[in-house]
């Protein structure tokens, strides 16, 4: 999971300038994302036990959501992409990467609620989430449904596979690194 998230973030960093993209890395796993803290794109790196920093991050993102909603309303545009086409000063895309989402429940109800609202409202505002988890039920269903694209690696329980990508003719591969991907409603094997 950590290697997958690392690959996603490095790929985004390679294809986007710092002026256009920032990362907020929430490393709730084994601290495997620490090296990404050196990327110029990384605005902040937060580990699981840094509760004060996490609280400040939540406040910062909530304020940014309000600011972006106001900017889009002033320009009378429906989303981040259209805003950046018409605005003189464009907005940066923000990617919030969460490794080991399973532990969010330990952070409390407020954290779960924050991520639910973020996953619902963020995409249209240019604030995107990428999260990893070991179980399909680690994330509330209402939050999970806000993710349009889903990737399932090897899972111990095959029924988790169907929860993540839906029913398909593909089955889980025993080969390490193989995944099932649900992208734009289609399921494929990688």
Question: Where are the model-predicted features located?
Answer:
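P-loop NTPase catalytic phosphate-binding loop
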Residues: 1-78, 85-174, 180-188
């Amino acid at each position: 999971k950590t290697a997958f998230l690392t690959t996603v973030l490095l790929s985004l960093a390679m294809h986007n300038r710092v002026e256009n993209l920032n990362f907020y890395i929430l490393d709730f796993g084994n601290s495997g994302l620490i090296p990404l803290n050196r990327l110029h794109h990384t605005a902040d790196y937060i580990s699981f036990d840094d509760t004060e920093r996490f609280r400040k991050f939540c406040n910062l993102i909530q304020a940014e959501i309000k600011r972006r909603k106001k900017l889009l309303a002033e320009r009378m545009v429906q989303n981040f992409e259209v805003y950046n086409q018409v605005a003189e000063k464009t907005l940066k895309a923000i990617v919030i990467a969460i490794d080991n989402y399973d532990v969010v429940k330990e952070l409390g109800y407020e954290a779960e609620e924050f991520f639910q609202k973020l996953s619902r409202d963020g995409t249209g505002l240019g604030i995107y989430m990428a999260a990893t988890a070991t179980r399909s039920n680690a994330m509330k269903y209402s939050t999970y449904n806000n993710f349009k694209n889903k990737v399932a690696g090897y899972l111990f329980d095959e029924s988790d596979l169907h929860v993540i990508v839906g029913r398909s003719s593909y089955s889980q591969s025993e080969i390490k690194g193989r995944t099932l991907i649900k992208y734009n409603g289609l399921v494929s094997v990688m």
